[in-house]
Amino acid sequence: MSIKTLTLYNFNTSYSFGKEEKKEKEQSLTSKLARLKDSYEKEGLRKAVEGIIIIHDHGHPHILLLQDNNYFKLPGGKLKPGENEIDGLIRKLTKKLSPTGTPVSDAPWEIGDHVSTWWRPNFEPSLFPYIPSHITKPKECKKLFVVTLPEKCKFAVSNNLSLIAVSLYEIYNNSQRYGAVISSIPALISRYTFVYLNVD
């Protein structure tokens, strides 16, 4: 398998950031699992997509995460019934990270490889990179895609969230703080070679 090269731009000089009044669902674990149960009862398996957005700071890869107090998550969300995964991820990233009114057709996201699939066997917090042998009807399937950015773009997130860049060495093997999915990212993207560019 050939090694792919990704071009990363500087977090501090390439991008601008703002906050807006955006309608965000309650982020508590209890409310999230309640929504999952309601969705499962109506539609069956919940299908979700999330983006591993990679940038650099001082020549080291960082991942963009949304933070709500001490809760961290990758940007993304639930697919609509029958929605294509790439289209759905672009829609969710645009809704959560772009200024209000940005057409999906103008979205800056460059969706790359699907690098991981995670399964939620029950209405509980735990996710696994496989379906446990005793589970016949998992409740959620979450797919992670690598996302890169052009040299310039503008972010705008909900007032109650922060968009932060976290280094790979902070994330790696740190499931206690970031959870199993996010802490696995350094291994998932180790197959890539990165080129670091700085734009004034």
UniProtKB/Swiss-Prot annotation:
<dbReference type="GO" id="GO:0031124">
    <property type="term" value="P:mRNA 3'-end processing"/>
</dbReference>
<dbReference type="GO" id="GO:0030154">
    <property type="term" value="P:cell differentiation"/>
</dbReference>
<keyword id="KW-0507">mRNA processing</keyword>
<protein>
    <recommendedName>
        <fullName>Cleavage and polyadenylation specificity factor subunit 5</fullName>
    </recommendedName>
</protein>
<keyword id="KW-0694">RNA-binding</keyword>
<dbReference type="Pfam" id="PF13869">
    <property type="entry name" value="NUDIX_2"/>
</dbReference>
<dbReference type="GO" id="GO:0051290">
    <property type="term" value="P:protein heterotetramerization"/>
</dbReference>
<keyword id="KW-0963">Cytoplasm</keyword>
<keyword id="KW-0221">Differentiation</keyword>
<dbReference type="GO" id="GO:0005634">
    <property type="term" value="C:nucleus"/>
</dbReference>
<dbReference type="GO" id="GO:0005849">
    <property type="term" value="C:mRNA cleavage factor complex"/>
</dbReference>
<feature type="domain" description="Nudix hydrolase">
    <location>
        <begin position="45"/>
        <end position="170"/>
    </location>
</feature>
<dbReference type="InterPro" id="IPR015797">
    <property type="entry name" value="NUDIX_hydrolase-like_dom_sf"/>
</dbReference>
<dbReference type="GO" id="GO:0180010">
    <property type="term" value="P:co-transcriptional mRNA 3'-end processing, cleavage and polyadenylation pathway"/>
</dbReference>
<comment type="subunit">
    <text>Homodimer (via N- and C-terminus); binds RNA as homodimer. Component of the cleavage factor Im (CFIm) complex.</text>
</comment>
<comment type="similarity">
    <text>Belongs to the Nudix hydrolase family. CPSF5 subfamily.</text>
</comment>
<dbReference type="GO" id="GO:0006397">
    <property type="term" value="P:mRNA processing"/>
</dbReference>
<dbReference type="GO" id="GO:0035925">
    <property type="term" value="F:mRNA 3'-UTR AU-rich region binding"/>
</dbReference>
<feature type="site" description="Interaction with RNA">
    <location>
        <position position="24"/>
    </location>
</feature>
<comment type="function">
    <text>Component of the cleavage factor Im (CFIm) complex that functions as an activator of the pre-mRNA 3'-end cleavage and polyadenylation processing required for the maturation of pre-mRNA into functional mRNAs. CFIm contributes to the recruitment of multiprotein complexes on specific sequences on the pre-mRNA 3'-end, so called cleavage and polyadenylation signals (pA signals). Most pre-mRNAs contain multiple pA signals, resulting in alternative cleavage and polyadenylation (APA) producing mRNAs with variable 3'-end formation.</text>
</comment>
<feature type="region of interest" description="Interaction with RNA">
    <location>
        <begin position="70"/>
        <end position="72"/>
    </location>
</feature>
<dbReference type="GO" id="GO:0110104">
    <property type="term" value="P:mRNA alternative polyadenylation"/>
</dbReference>
<keyword id="KW-0539">Nucleus</keyword>
<dbReference type="GO" id="GO:0003729">
    <property type="term" value="F:mRNA binding"/>
</dbReference>
<feature type="short sequence motif" description="Nudix box">
    <location>
        <begin position="77"/>
        <end position="98"/>
    </location>
</feature>
<dbReference type="InterPro" id="IPR016706">
    <property type="entry name" value="Cleav_polyA_spec_factor_su5"/>
</dbReference>
<dbReference type="InterPro" id="IPR000086">
    <property type="entry name" value="NUDIX_hydrolase_dom"/>
</dbReference>
<dbReference type="GO" id="GO:0005737">
    <property type="term" value="C:cytoplasm"/>
</dbReference>
